[in-house]
A protein has these predicted regions:
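Short alpha-helical segment immediately N-terminal to, or the first helix within
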Residues: 27-29
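Alpha-helical DNA-recognition elements
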Residues: 56
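Short, Lys/Arg-rich nucleic-acid/phosphate-binding segment
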Residues: 67-76
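Residues within the DNA-recognition helix of helix-turn-helix
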Residues: 53
Length: 120
C-alpha cells in the first residue's frame, strides 16, 4: 500500500512532537507568539539548540516563522493550529477503536454465556 501525503504529514508531526523540549516549545507558543530569544530563555536552551528544534517544528508544519516589519533580524514564531488536525483526526480514530473494543469487552463480561454453550 502506497503511503498517502497525509501519512507523511502525520509522521512528521509525531516525530516533531516526540521530543519533550519541542512539546514545551509548542505549549509556550500556544500561549502567545514569541521571539526566538524569548523562547530560548523560557526553555533554557542555547540559541543553536533552539534553532535546530524550531527547524524540526517548522518542517513538520507545526510552527511558522514571521518577520517584523521594522526589523528583518527579528523573527516571531507561532503555532500553526491547522497542522494539528491530522493528529487530532488520527487520535479520534484510535479513541473510537478503543471505545468500541471496550464496549464489546464489557458486553462479553456482563453476559459470559455464548449461544450453544451448555449451562454450568
Amino acid at each position: 500500500m502506497e503511503p498517502r501525503p497525509a501519512d507523511f504529514q502525520l509522521s512528521a508531526a509525531f516525530g516533531a512532537l516526540s521530543d519533550a523540549s519541542r512539546r514545551e516549545m509548542i505549549r509556550l507558543l500556544l500561549q502567545k507568539p514569541r521571539r526566538a530569544g524569548e523562547l530560548a530563555e523560557c526553555v533554557e536552551m542555547s540559541p543553536q539548540a533552539l534553532s535546530r528544534h524550531l527547524r524540526v517544528l517548522r518542517k513538520a508544519g507545526l510552527v511558522s516563522e514571521h518577520g517584523v516589519e521594522n526589523d528583518a533580524r527579528v523573527r516571531i514564531y507561532s503555532v500553526q493550529a491547522t497542522a494539528f488536525q491530522p493528529v487530532q483526526q488520527w487520535m479520534a480514530q484510535v479513541e473510537d477503536l478503543w471505545r468500541r473494543q471496550l464496549q464489546a469487552f464489557k458486553a462479553l463480561a456482563e453476559n459470559p454465556r455464548r449461544p450453544g454453550r451448555p449451562k454450568t
